[in-house]
């Protein structure tokens, strides 16, 4: 079997997802990856995978859309470079899979070149419903609806709730399969500066965009600092911190350390090894099937404080890997952190549970489930 993956994004976690899936699938099939010239996962792809640098990078990401930081000309060049999706018909794989959330340029040029007509075409939907249709999404969503769609042979989602949403809202898909998001264990294998775990230290990691709810975590800092002596917080990722958080950030500058930049792969392990707890204060309304940050937290066996969104209650709460709190509530986040830091034995139990989840969501097991889907489509 020959599987071709389309990497529709050059930055963030989606290239990592594609690389991990391609690497593990190479144990079962011949694998080709069609990707932009430079991505955040280039060093992750195995040598045995055929890599074709077919596209130019785009400046389009959720972060840049929210921050209105787009280089229009570069973005247009990048988008139109996906014309090279036509290469799929020359390569002629048995399966085509877009695991990067159906970006519009991938859908458009897959439709233009009819790459779905002679072979099964699979997509992975990491986000099945975007909440908060205000702001930039009020403009973007109607534009996306203009992109031609076509019948997909199968869709992969990460939770049963996502499957139901997709079946109700996505007309152009034949079947929907639930396959969990694999754990990003490759970060542990990189050459990074491992740190001793720091007592009472929490980490927020990822793009600073509105759905991530960073303001609720920052607003929780005063209460946690009062109740937990020695508490500290690192916020690591590129994007914008809301202006209304400025007073708390300034007042608690000895508690909050902000690295407002893209974190290179080789520095991710340093941040996670140092953290005692990882916090995901995500907003409600964003139907996330998983999170790259959550995947990394599991890989490092970290206890997790997360909002009650998507399948986080099952992955974190029911597994015992952490505490699930009410979304958009600084008070709830603060109470969760205070509870976690109040018991060393609870921290140890959560850490062990987090590591068990990592074993259950290994990419070897995830690839096996994908391979079964592919086989049934042929």
Curated annotation (Swiss-Prot):
Task: Identify the domain of life.
Answer: Archaea
- Show the SUPFAM superfamilies listed in the entry: UDP-Glycosyltransferase/glycogen phosphorylase
Signal peptide range in chain numbering: none
Q: What phenotype is described for loss of this gene?
A: Abolishes formation of the tetrasaccharide present at 'Asn-532' of S-layer glycoprotein Csg. No effect on 'Asn-47' and 'Asn-117' glycosylation of S-layer glycoprotein Csg.
**Record keywords: Transferase included?**
yes
The entry's keywords: Glycosyltransferase, Transferase
**UniProt-recorded name of the protein:** Low-salt glycan biosynthesis hexosyltransferase Agl5
What does the record give under GO molecular function?
A: glycosyltransferase activity
Similarity comment: family membership: Belongs to the glycosyltransferase group 1 family.
Gene of this entry: agl5
GO biological process, alphabetically ordered: protein glycosylation; S-layer organization
């Amino acid at each position: 079997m020959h599987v071709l993956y389309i990497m529709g994004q050059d930055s963030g976690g989606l290239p990592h997802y594609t690389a991990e899936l391609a690497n593990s699938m190479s144990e079962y099939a011949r694998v080709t990856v069609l990707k932009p010239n430079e991505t955040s996962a280039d060093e992750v792809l195995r040598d045995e995978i055929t890599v074709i640098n077919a596209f130019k990078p785009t400046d389009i990401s959720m972060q840049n859309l929210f921050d209105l930081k787009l280089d229009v000309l570069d973005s247009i060049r990048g988008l139109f470079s996906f014309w090279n999706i036509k290469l799929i018909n020359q390569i002629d794989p048995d399966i085509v899979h877009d695991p990067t959330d159906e970006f519009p340029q991938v859908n458009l040029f897959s439709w233009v070149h009819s790459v779905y007509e002679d072979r099964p075409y699979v997509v992975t939907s990491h986000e099945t419903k975007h909440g908060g249709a205000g702001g930039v999404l009020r403009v973007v969503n109607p534009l996306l609806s203009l992109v031609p769609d076509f019948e997909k042979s199968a869709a992969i989602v990460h939770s049963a709730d996502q499957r139901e949403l997709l079946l109700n809202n996505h007309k152009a898909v034949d079947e929907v399969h639930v396959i969990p998001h694999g754990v990003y264990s490759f970060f542990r294998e990189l050459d990074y500066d491992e740190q001793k775990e720091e007592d009472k230290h929490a980490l927020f990691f990822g793009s600073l965009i509105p759905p991530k709810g960073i303001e609720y975590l920052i607003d929780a800092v005063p209460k946690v600092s009062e109740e937990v002596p020695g508490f500290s917080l690192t916020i690591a990722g590129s994007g914008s911190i809301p202006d209304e958080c400025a007073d708390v950030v300034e007042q608690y500058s000895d508690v909050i350390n902000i690295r407002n930049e893209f974190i290179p792969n080789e520095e991710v392990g340093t941040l996670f090894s140092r953290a005692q707890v990882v916090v995901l204060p995500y907003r409600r309304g964003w139907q996330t099937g998983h999170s790259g940050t959550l995947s990394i937290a599991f890989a490092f066996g970290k206890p997790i404080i997360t909002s009650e969104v998507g399948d986080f209650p099952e992955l974190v709460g029911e597994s015992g890997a952490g505490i699930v709190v009410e979304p958009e509530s600084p008070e709830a986040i603060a109470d969760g952190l205070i509870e976690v830091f109040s018991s060393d034995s609870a921290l140890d139990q959560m850490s062990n549970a987090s590591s068990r989840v990592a074993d259950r969501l290994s990419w070897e097991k995830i690839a096996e489930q994908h391979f079964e889907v592919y086989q049934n489509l042929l």
